[in-house]
Amino acid sequence: MRQGVLLPMGLVVMGAWFNAAHAQSYPLKPVRIVVPYAAGGPYDEIVRTLGQRLTEIWGQAVVVENRGGAGGNIGADVVAKAAPDGYTLLLGNAGPITVNPTLVKKLPYDPQRDFVPVSMVNASRMVLSVHPSLPAKNVKELMALARANPGRLNYGSSGVGNLQHLGMELLRIQAGVTMNHVPYKGAAPAFVDLISGQVDLMFANIVGTLPHVRTARVRAVAVSTATRSPLLPDVPSVAETYKGFDIPTWSGIFAPAGTSRDIVAKLNGDIIKVLQRADLKERYAQQGSEATPSTPEALAEHVRKETVMYAGVIKAAKVNAE
């Protein structure tokens, strides 16, 4: 009886030892991080800055691979179906992780089942800006204007179902106002029409908005996160008027489900070490972003809560991207 018990226990101990030893030597070859968007977007610089510093620690290359399409779903699906060995990772964000599970009817993966959270990487803000001819100087005045003119104000976004769109819908719902959504194929044409007065307002990322604010072509009335931005310290957050409003743009590292806990722990520790470096924080700050290292558990909880929040907005606003 004792031998029958000891043999399986020995195998368990050996397996645990092997996993721990494997994690300590990880990585033994280049690590691929998939960005689920076309090259040249804002997440490229975020992940390349991270990857360069991980390469210094590991002595192994970090290869950034852009796999754009379907709102981030194609790249995310590539990682969901990859071997769970730590050598293929996803730089995930709200689109493929917390929005698309509700927005897309036939998603080829389940974000909370098919991925293991590793660490949050960065977070940034959107800016709510208006055409200068609009009399509103803050979000309270803006929503009062919309309430007094139901269906008269038009807001732009870079497409249906993205954070610019959903952020405005959440604000509209919380304020109890009616506005018209005008989707564009990207932020650039939306800004052209905002500056020319074809649309009245829009949410957009802070880096893309700042040049237009500084040249007074648009007026910033609020930022989308719970706290103000160091880049626009005089611009209040929406949450100062509508409590609980918090729509950050963010990214995090995810591994395929089944990746060993030891490798996830090694990745998490090294990513946190890199994100705490002063040179990386400065680099991110130049892009209007903040390094936001986290535990895997904290990222998992963020994903869970945000998925519920966006599901509520999508259903309440009857958003349909298909």
Describe the function of each predicted region:
Residues 97-106, 170-174, 201-234:
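A ligand-binding cleft/hinge motif common to bilobed small-molecule-binding domains
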Residues 48, 52, 56, 77, ...:
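Solvent-exposed, polar/charged alpha-helical surfaces in well-ordered, non-transmembrane soluble domains
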